[in-house]
Amino acid sequence: ILLIFIFPDWRPAGSSNHGQLVTPVRPLPPFQMENLAGEQMDETSLRGKWTLVYLQQGACDKLCVEQLYSIRQVRLAQGKNIDRLQRLLVWENGGVSREDQAELQQHFPGQLIVPLTDQHALVQVFSLDEQKPMTARRVYLVDPLGNLMMHYEPDDEPKGMIKDLERLLKYSGLG
């Protein structure tokens, strides 16, 4: 463990996680938004549970739907630990119709959906490299303390997410 603090980019050869660890973890900044259900959300809304986050700019296209489906299946695969995990879509919805919003809510029940009207400070936490967070198509994992700690690329297999989460939920007393 000491080596990780001294050399944060180093990973042992036997590292078995499928996602990319975010080192150091990034705490989510304070935020205040309203989800599609009209409920106020802030940073405490994401505390106490592991949260799979997907950021989308504009209409939810085929890849967006596939990612949301994968996230839902990953959560369902957690069995008895399903209640320790939640899903969040942060959606820059410039011009997206109410019908599209309603369709997303219908197809992905229980999915927290938060529309953005501007580049919120929350989104900047997800900026990991030269790719803009709203167009990177990644799935991000936020821990129950409100820290961004891992991400998955668009072509990563959901089975890897399932295995990582099974391990995290098994060995973590959080969430």
Explain the meaning of each model-derived region.
Residues Q56-G58, V90-G94:
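Structural motif
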Residues T135-G175:
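Thiol-/selenol-based redox modules, centered on thioredoxin-like
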Residues I1-F5:
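Hydrophobic membrane-insertion alpha-helices, especially the h-region
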Residues E43-I71:
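Short active-site neighborhood of thiol/selenol oxidoreductases, capturing the structured segment around
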Residues Y54, R87-L89, L141:
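Structural beta-sheet core signal
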Residues W10, L68-L89:
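Conserved helix-turn-beta segment immediately C-terminal to the redox Cys motif
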Residues Q86-L88, G95, E99-R137:
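Short, internal strand/loop/helix patches
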